[in-house]
Amino acid sequence: MFNRIVALTQKVLDGGQINQIEALELAQAEGADILILAAMAAKIREKYVGDKVELCSIISVKTGHCPEDCAFCAQSVHHHTEITPTEMLEEEKILAKAKAMEAAGAHRFDLVTAGLGMTEEDEDFKKILAIYKRLRQEVKLELCACLGTLTEKAAMQLREVGVTRYNHNLETARSFFSNIVTTHTYDERIETIKNVKKAGMEVCCGGIIGMGETMEQRIEFAFTLKELDVDAIPINVLNPIKGTKLENRPLLSPLEVIKTFAIFRFILPDKNIRYAGGREVNLRDMQALGLMAGLNGMLIGHYLTTKGREVETDLQMIRDLGLKI
């Protein structure tokens, strides 16, 4: 296994690309070979994207009461969770959070809403455009948005008010998607990705591992992201939330998570691959290893409905690894 990992690493370092069969070979790594795989993924990350860790922060500006049935989500009306639905968050609170995250060291700030999506006619969308105009004036953060499905016209309007990157996750492989979502289709999500590209924004598109998919399906998913040529790939690790359909899913083992991160880097050598939610409960004391397994970005602060670590703890972890912020 060692020799094969090294050979495929050299192939990628020399500018080549691995195929799905070769990715499945890497997935056979176990025990110490996973650490070798992680180290080689770090070499690939160093060559293609360097040693700087991009830090993103998010804020839920409209929470809960979502009509979609995503099996993992605490905000769905199909589930019985402890989430309290809210209307649009006050503009001043959003500004205050942005300034606090900028002071803490974040590079990007993302406004997130619950629901299937928005059009340019929605009143909440018009409010969000106004908020982005203020953010562009009052902070130096790169601005991101995550508002669900999006028309091409709405995407253009976001770009015009300063949004540079749009997040819309595919969540998982096409072959597994219907096990997780039934109220909309994979192609609807892909259509939004295409609209974002047409508008000239970067695409942030990832998903969640640990929902019951196979490693083969994770690899299928990574190659879909490669084909779509997305810019940033947030990888969540399922944090099963009580009251959702996936509340009883077992956690992935830390080494399984690390192996998955590394394989994504082999498949997507020059992309921004980042930690998203779930690292605290799944990786525990091994969170640093993710950044040494090919990741070059992370969400800091709290998530949409779950708590993250203290920001300074994450910043110290990055410094301890010899990486740059």
From Swiss-Prot:
Pfam families: BATS (PF06968), Radical_SAM (PF04055). It catalyses: (4R,5S)-dethiobiotin + (sulfur carrier)-SH + 2 reduced [2Fe-2S]-[ferredoxin] + 2 S-adenosyl-L-methionine = (sulfur carrier)-H + biotin + 2 5'-deoxyadenosine + 2 L-methionine + 2 oxidized [2Fe-2S]-[ferredoxin]. [2Fe-2S] cluster binds at C144, C204, R274. [4Fe-4S] cluster binds at C66, C70, C73. Its cofactor is [4Fe-4S] cluster; [2Fe-2S] cluster. Pathway: Cofactor biosynthesis; biotin biosynthesis; biotin from 7,8-diaminononanoate: step 2/2. Signal peptide: none annotated. Binds 1 [4Fe-4S] cluster. The cluster is coordinated with 3 cysteines and an exchangeable S-adenosyl-L-methionine. Binds 1 [2Fe-2S] cluster. The cluster is coordinated with 3 cysteines and 1 arginine. Residues 49-279 form the Radical SAM core domain. Its EC number is 2.8.1.6. Keywords: 2Fe-2S, 4Fe-4S, Biotin biosynthesis, Iron, Iron-sulfur, Metal-binding, S-adenosyl-L-methionine, Transferase. CDD domains: Radical_SAM (cd01335). Homodimer. Belongs to the radical SAM superfamily. Biotin synthase family. Catalyzes the conversion of dethiobiotin (DTB) to biotin by the insertion of a sulfur atom into dethiobiotin via a radical-based mechanism. HAMAP family: BioB (MF_01694). This is Biotin synthase. It comes from Carboxydothermus hydrogenoformans (strain ATCC BAA-161 / DSM 6008 / Z-2901). The gene is bioB.
